[in-house]
């Protein structure tokens, strides 16, 4: 008799299915908190696997990038064409504390700005804020008709484009290097930098629709929890207050 596996005996019962485990049963929901510079603090929720063994849930959450519309953050529909990127830097309990990580325009807004019969002028520059953030700012602008112009086209000469681009470099560098990241983000919303560029280039060639269309963080300083908590409007003063206690030192005994 040949010795070997009996295939008939080794086969299991047909029709028995594996027990399906819901993957969401091993996950937890965490709240995403935006910095205090925005009106809406609760941005949304994010999922992460529970801490198990050497794997910590907090480590999986840190570094996550969340993209949110500025219209949702400030409850203003007019600002919905700006996309704000937030990065999770700290986890406290079930809250993910975020910091500004970048800004961009929606593609439909950019396409709506580009038209015929005008010159598009773009510039980008690397700037460093007072708190040590290295950013790359991208500016965009379009030529417009002069008040007394009859001609349909508003094309600028290459020499004028170079001059306007130079003004863009100077203004973006000046505005960004004299403030910290929080103040710079607040300048994006009312388009203060764009208005400055428009005003400065009026003598060269009149511009319209001037925006800082994109901001990208290239390098961030060493992470500091106290600064992040300050950005979220929470105190991190760990120095305790001295409490007066009714304590009397016992008298020294002369003999025992």
Swiss-Prot record:
Q: What is its main location?
A: cytoplasm
Output the Gene Ontology cellular-component terms: cytosolic small ribosomal subunit
Fetch the PROSITE patterns from UniProt: RIBOSOMAL_S3AE
UniProt-annotated location(s): Cytoplasm
The answer to keyword Cytoplasm applying to this record is yes
Identify one Pfam family in the record. Ribosomal_S3Ae
Gene Ontology biological process terms in this record? translation
Which residues in this protein are found as N-acetylalanine?
Answer: 2
Output the Gene Ontology terms for molecular function. structural constituent of ribosome
Keyword set for this entry?
Answer: Acetylation, Cytoplasm, Ribonucleoprotein, Ribosomal protein
Outline the subunit composition: Component of the small ribosomal subunit. Mature ribosomes consist of a small (40S) and a large (60S) subunit. The 40S subunit contains about 33 different proteins and 1 molecule of RNA (18S). The 60S subunit contains about 49 different proteins and 3 molecules of RNA (25S, 5.8S and 5S).
HAMAP family the record matches: Ribosomal_eS1_euk (MF_03122)
Task: Give the family per the record.
Answer: Belongs to the eukaryotic ribosomal protein eS1 family.
- Which protein is depicted? Small ribosomal subunit protein eS1
Species, as recorded? Lentinula edodes
């Amino acid at each position: 008799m040949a010795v070997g596996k009996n295939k008939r005996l080794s086969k299991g019962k047909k029709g028995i299915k594996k027990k399906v485990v819901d993957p969401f049963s091993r996950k937890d929901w965490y709240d995403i908190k935006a910095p205090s510079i925005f009106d809406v603090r609760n941005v949304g929720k994010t999922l992460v696997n529970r801490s198990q063994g050497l794997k910590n849930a907090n480590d999986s959450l840190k570094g996550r990038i969340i993209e949110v519309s500025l219209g949702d953050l400030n409850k203003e529909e007019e600002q919905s064409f700006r996309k704000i990127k937030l990065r999770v830097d700290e986890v406290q309990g079930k809250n993910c504390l975020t910091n500004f990580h970048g800004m961009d325009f929606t593609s439909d807004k950019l396409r709506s700005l580009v038209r015929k019969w005008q010159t598009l002028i773009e510039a980008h520059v690397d700037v460093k804020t007072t708190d040590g953030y290295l950013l790359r700012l991208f500016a965009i602008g379009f030529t417009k008709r002069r008040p007394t112009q009859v001609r349909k086209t508003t094309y600028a000469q290459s020499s004028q484009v170079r001059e306007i681009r130079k003004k863009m470099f100077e203004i973006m560098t000046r505005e960004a290097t004299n403030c910290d990241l929080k103040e710079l983000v607040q300048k994006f919303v009312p388009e203060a930098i764009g208005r400055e560029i428009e005003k400065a280039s009026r003598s060269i060639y009149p511009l319209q629709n001037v925006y800082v269309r994109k901001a990208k963080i290239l390098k961030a300083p060493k992470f500091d929890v106290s600064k992040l908590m300050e950005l979220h409007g929470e105190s991190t003063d760990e120095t305790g207050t001295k409490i007066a206690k009714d304590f009397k030192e016992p008298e020294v005994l002369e003999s025992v």
